[in-house]
UniProtKB/Swiss-Prot annotation:
Insecticidal, cytolytic and antimicrobial peptide. Forms voltage-dependent, ion-permeable channels in membranes. At high concentration causes cell membrane lysis. Expressed by the venom gland. It comes from Lachesana tarabaevi (Spider). Belongs to the cationic peptide 06 (cytoinsectotoxin) family. Residues 1-20 form the signal peptide. This is M-zodatoxin-Lt8b. One of its GO terms (molecular function) is toxin activity. One of its GO terms (biological process) is killing of cells of another organism. A motif (Processing quadruplet motif) lies at residues 57-60. It is found in: Secreted. Coiled coil: none annotated. The gene is cit 1-2.
Length: 129
């Protein structure tokens, strides 16, 4: 259970990274510098910081591809977990559960799993108290 929650948190973190807005390119920074005729030291520091972000674009490309692979595997695992839970919880056959899961969207599957594991975690926490 702990590993599933940690994996889910990592998937959410990688989703935020992959969907973040791309940094400005060095060419755009040069145009901004020419337009504003930087005399203020704070503006120069800000532009220098943005110039360093071009390295992040390369890293984002690497993590974007890695993220897609991780997300694909996580989706497959979630589908299998959802089918197993439906079979166990509702007492239906594996084929019926698979048909129900196939009809659900990815968001609905995530909510179904989070609801189940959230209740389970809450029960364990209340038992410890």
């Amino acid at each position: 259970m702990k590993y599933f929650v940690v994996a889910l948190a990592l998937v959410a973190a990688f989703a935020c990274i992959a969907e973040s807005k791309p940094a400005e390119s060095e060419h755009e920074l040069a145009e901004v510098e020419e337009e504003n005729e930087l005399a203020d030291l704070e503006d120069a520091v800000w532009l220098e910081h943005l110039a360093d972000l071009s390295d992040l674009e390369e890293a984002r490309g690497f993590f974007g591809n890695t993220w897609k692979k991780i997300k694909g595997k996580a989706d497959k695992i979630m589908l299998k977990k959802a089918v197993k839970l439906m079979v166990k919880k509702e007492g239906i056959s594996k084929e019926e559960a698979q048909a129900k899961v196939d009809a659900m969207s990815k968001k609905q599957i995530r909510l179904y799993l989070l609801k189940y594991y959230g209740k389970k975690a809450l029960q364990k926490a209340s038992e410890k108290l």
